[in-house]
Amino acid sequence: MKHLIGLQGMAAESIKEILDRAALHKHLFINQENAIRPSLKGKRIALAFFENSTRTRFSFEIAARNLGAQTLNFSASSSSLSKGESMIDTIRNLEAMRVDAFIIRHPSSGSAEMIGKSTDKHVINAGDGSREHPTQALLDIFTLREYFGSLEGIKVMILGDILHSRVARSNIFGLTTLGAEVAVCGPATLLPVDTSRLGIRIFSQLDEALGWADAAIVLRLQLERATGGYLPSLQDYSFTFGLTDERLEKIKKHLPVLHPGPINREIEISGNVADRIQPPGFSQSMLLEQVTNGVAVRTAVLELLISPQPDT
């Protein structure tokens, strides 16, 4: 595999290979065994982030350094892009500095694919517009596989702004490929029109969706949706679709809850639900476990793509 642009069309075997290697890296990361695993020693990796990021950027940087690679941090605001240089010219200049791989985050859908077609170096999509965010989905899938043991037949409900979410799209592609059942729930104005061709269920009532689900992935609500005509108000969204203890108590079953972060407390998820990492209660927050798993998954992706023969 030359690039990781998205999970759409990726074979189940390729996804499982990443997850299996991530399990190895998580063990090493947690136990601090051989903290530096130099399979990418001498490689240069450019983190070209045209959008702000905390978890994704830092976890990729930790992953690269744990593999012995050098990282170059690129900021659009302080680069020649601010002087009018095109994105492709910027990439070509970094190529001339013997960069081996690009990790790209960009607000435009399709940008990572365009760069992948313009360079012979490795390209990893760290989120492009509303299209895909493959490594976020991979770490979500890894978290769920750790929790359930297998994803075959597991019912996963994705809650929130599906229409604009690259995280939702990548999760739908990856989860269904591995045999999970997927449903989405949210306001009609924030659901895409093409859900039927994706082979997923649609719920308009959160209580019904929670009763169906084995696990929930809650998406961050972009606050501008309330002023963009998509929602009556944030308060209305929170009342109808916010994940709270009161809602979870109605279903009387234990539910792992995931969220890609950052969270809007008391809007899409209550503080109690976000912070509960163990019983008692009817939910278990996986949010911090996802962050740890993000380092492991991104380490696996870098190693499998860039190292010709990863150490075993």
From Swiss-Prot:
Gene3D superfamilies: Aspartate/ornithine carbamoyltransferase (3.40.50.1370)
GO MF terms, alphabetically ordered: amino acid binding; aspartate carbamoyltransferase activity
GO cellular component, one term: cytosol
Subunit comment: Heterododecamer (2C3:3R2) of six catalytic PyrB chains organized as two trimers (C3), and six regulatory PyrI chains organized as three dimers (R2).
Task performed by this protein: Catalyzes the condensation of carbamoyl phosphate and aspartate to form carbamoyl aspartate and inorganic phosphate, the committed step in the de novo pyrimidine nucleotide biosynthesis pathway.
Family of the protein in this entry: Belongs to the aspartate/ornithine carbamoyltransferase superfamily. ATCase family.
Name of the molecule in the record: Aspartate carbamoyltransferase catalytic subunit
Source organism: Prosthecochloris aestuarii (strain DSM 271 / SK 413)
Taxonomic placement: Bacteria, Pseudomonadati, Chlorobiota, Chlorobiia, Chlorobiales
